[in-house]
């Protein structure tokens, strides 16, 4: 099936030119191209059109889960009839195994898996295994982490069709080999049950159940049914059932793996004894032998991923299989915010190896644990056939890879211009800045101020508050959820000024901000590099009155580059607007507050948090921060009976699962904290 893009919008501005150039580059075999697009220019829409034009399976790489979720939702909107999938880490919580020799502390691995994301990950792999060409996978850096190989996955696909002669028990054995679990009592995702001549399989990558019925040894019908009502949804002549886990292997390979593990255990035990370290020798012997017993009896053990090299049949040092192995060789890679995403890929391997070094050296793991790892950057690079790097500030790597093939997208559909940049001396900068702030507040506009240190941010905020300016600060010591609330409060007018250290975060969308003030702009370093200054200045690009003031006594090379590049873009935008009679329009964006903004609202939310409902036509929901919830809701909770508490826990659990299904992880975390508090109250009531 071909890609079919669906949108009420048509490419405008320089989007058509960017789409054409990128499409031609891919069709002509260009290995790498850069899409240099300014904030708000519709880069995602451009990429969607390119994907539709070239018709290649595409991996879109983002540098965090939240932005990946946004891209996933956008792409699903553009391609409702195609396979748009989501592949990120499925851990709600993850504490990796570690050993701290200085304190002789061993930290056991601890984790909580998000069932909904696990389903989406399996759905992504299943779509790729199906051979479809119209597949888009939006992924975080998880795509470079180890998983089962495509050959083993292919071998465990169960293909059935109506009229097929197939012994039912043989079919059940195949399901078990594909890591489905029999459960005749409660059918859950990844389970199957048997009732007479009917087998129900709750697909690991779907919300529905596959029902297969037999007539003697012949498959009589194949139907998809609703997992709750069991009403028939569809009938099939043939069907492919994909494995229930990404780490599938055969029994033969498992037996080979156990023998290899035992051989390596003997070698490692002898090594520790040869250096006179009997404690480590005893430790590795006990731990590995216990794991072997678990694998023989149950087919798995805690930390089985550390033995993945043996189960995959890989040699020592050979790279693991990852999501990229499931794509055809000519797939297209799109790296969003590439100036951040590419360095992140390069950093994964070193951190993983450093942690495992102590585990191996002190006898907690065999050396094979090193081979359960993310790809090195060189390995990742070797698997890329064609790539588009998307960024407003592409780094040297992307520019070098593209060999100058840079496609610019500088025109915004709204006609908004890049902000003017003005340099002012640092002498009396605070008084000057205060005057600028008052000018903005009279127009009901907002101000961002970026400093070099946390202390400066806090002291400047205190100064502004003493001068009756509604100000707040935000930096890394402020909790993530509090930062989100501060951003929403800034937009809502609770604050007029936000002071921070690093306010250049990609995706920070604050259309009310008309002034960005950069203090100590001439202090060269990471926070005042050309790319950081450009990203920071871009925060004022969503307001029709956008302006940037750099306070500095000298103009550094980074400042000059930012000023020159912004002026160049601005002149192009002005000319385009003049030629086409476009008047810049202020962006109007609804404020969707995720948290209560007052004690009264928090109290109302606490009273009704167990009755939150997404009514038809309504999107409003109430969140409670963990500390606020404890403070305002305890009197209500304490008055509840055991039955009411149990009902509240069940209702909130359902809401948590729905939030996770909607990829709203922040809300899911809020519900989780509420559940923990309710359970604690229930335990106290006995």
Task: Give the label of every model feature segment.
Residues 87-98, 109-120, 451-456, 472-488, ...:
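Conserved helicase motor
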Residues 1-36:
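Conserved pre-motif I regulatory segment
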Residues 80-89, 303, 446-448, 460-482:
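Conserved RecA-like helicase motor-core motifs
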Residues 28-50:
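Walker A/P-loop
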Residues 151, 453-475, 677, 681:
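Conserved helicase motor "Helicase C" RecA-like lobe of SF1/SF2 P-loop NTPases
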Residues 34, 87-432, 436-442, 461, ...:
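N-terminal cationic and glycine-rich segments that engage phosphates or anionic surfaces
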Residues 27-34, 56-57, 133-135, 445-446:
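Pre-Walker A (Motif I) flank of P-loop NTPase domains
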């Amino acid at each position: 099936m071909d890609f079919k893009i669906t949108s009420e919008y048509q490419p405008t501005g320089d989007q058509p030119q960017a789409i054409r150039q990128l499409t031609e580059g891919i069709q002509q075999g260009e290995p790498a191209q850069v899409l240099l697009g300014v904030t708000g220019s519709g880069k995602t829409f451009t990429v969607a059109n390119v994907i539709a034009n070239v018709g290649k399976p595409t991996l879109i790489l983002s540098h965090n889960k939240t932005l990946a979720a946004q891209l996933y939702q956008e792409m699903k909107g553009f391609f409702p009839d195609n396979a748009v999938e989501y592949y990120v880490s499925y851990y709600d919580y993850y504490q990796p195994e570690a050993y701290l020799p200085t304190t002789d502390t061993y930290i056991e691995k601890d984790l909580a898996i998000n069932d909904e994301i696990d389903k989406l990950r399996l759905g992504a792999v299943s779509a790729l295994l199906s051979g479809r060409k119209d597949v888009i996978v939006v992924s975080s850096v998880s795509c470079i982490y180890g998983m089962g190989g495509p050959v083993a996955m292919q071998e465990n696909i169960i293909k059935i069709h109506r009229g097929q002669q197939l012994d039912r028990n043989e079919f059940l054995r195949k399901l078990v080999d594909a890591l489905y679990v029999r459960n005749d009592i409660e059918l859950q995702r990844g389970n199957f049950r048997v009732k007479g001549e009917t087998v129900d399989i709750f697909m690991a990558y779907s919300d529905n159940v596959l029902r297969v019925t037999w007539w003697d040894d012949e498959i009589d019908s194949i139907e998809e049914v609703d997992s709750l009502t069991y009403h028939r949804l569809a009938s099939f002549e043939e069907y492919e059932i994909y494995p229930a886990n990404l780490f599938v292997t055969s029994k033969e390979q498992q037996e080979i793996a156990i023998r290899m593990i035992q051989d390596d255990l003997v070698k490692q035990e002898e090594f520790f004894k040869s250096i006179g370290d009997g404690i480590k020798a005893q430790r590795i012997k006990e731990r590995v032998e216990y794991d072997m017993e678990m694998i023989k009896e149950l087919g798995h053990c805690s930390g089985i991923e550390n033995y993945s090299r043996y189960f995959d049949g890989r040699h020592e040092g050979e790279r693991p299989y990852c999501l990229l192995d499931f794509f055809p060789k000519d797939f297209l890679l799109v790296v969003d915010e590439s100036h951040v995403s590419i360095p992140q890929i390069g950093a994964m391997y070193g951190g993983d190896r450093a942690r495992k070094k102590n585990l191996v050296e002190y006898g907690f793991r065999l050396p094979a644990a090193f081979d359960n790892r993310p790809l090195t950057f060189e390995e990742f690079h070797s698997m890329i056939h064609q790539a588009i790097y998307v960024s407003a500030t592409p780094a040297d790597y992307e520019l070098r890879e593209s060999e100058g093939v840079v496609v610019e997208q500088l025109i915004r559909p709204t006609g908004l211009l890049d902000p003017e940049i003005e340099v002012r001396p640092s002498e009396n900068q605070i008084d000057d800045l205060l005057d600028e702030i008052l000018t903005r507040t009279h127009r009901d506009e907002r101000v961002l101020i970026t400093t070099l240190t946390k202390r400066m941010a806090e002291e400047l905020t205190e100064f502004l508050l003493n001068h009756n300016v509604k100000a707040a600060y935000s930096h890394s010591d402020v909790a993530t959820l509090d930062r989100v609330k501060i951003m929403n409060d800034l937009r809502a007018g609770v604050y007029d000024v936000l002071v921070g250290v690093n306010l250049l975060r990609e995706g920070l969308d604050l259309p009310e901000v008309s002034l960005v003030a950069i203090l100590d702009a001439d202090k060269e370093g990471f926070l005042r590099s050309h790319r950081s200054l450009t990203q920071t200045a871009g925060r004022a690009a969503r307001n029709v009155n956008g302006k940037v003031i750099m306070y500095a006594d000298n103009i550094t090379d980074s400042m000059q580059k930012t000023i020159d590049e912004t002026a160049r873009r601005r002149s192009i935008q002005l000319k385009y607007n003049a030629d086409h009679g476009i008047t810049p329009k202020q962006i109007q964006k609804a404020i969707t507050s995720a948290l209560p903004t007052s004690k009264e609202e928090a109290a109302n939310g606490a009273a009704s948090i167990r009755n939150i409902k997404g009514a038809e036509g309504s999107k409003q929901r109430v969140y409670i921060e963990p500390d606020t919830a404890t403070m305002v809701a305890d009197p209500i909770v304490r008055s509840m009976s055991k039955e009411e508490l149990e009902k509240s826990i069940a209702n909130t659990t359902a809401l948590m699962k729905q939030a996770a299904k909607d990829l709203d992880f922040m809300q899911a975390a809020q519900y989780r904290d509420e559940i923990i508090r309710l359970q604690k109250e229930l335990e106290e009531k006995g």
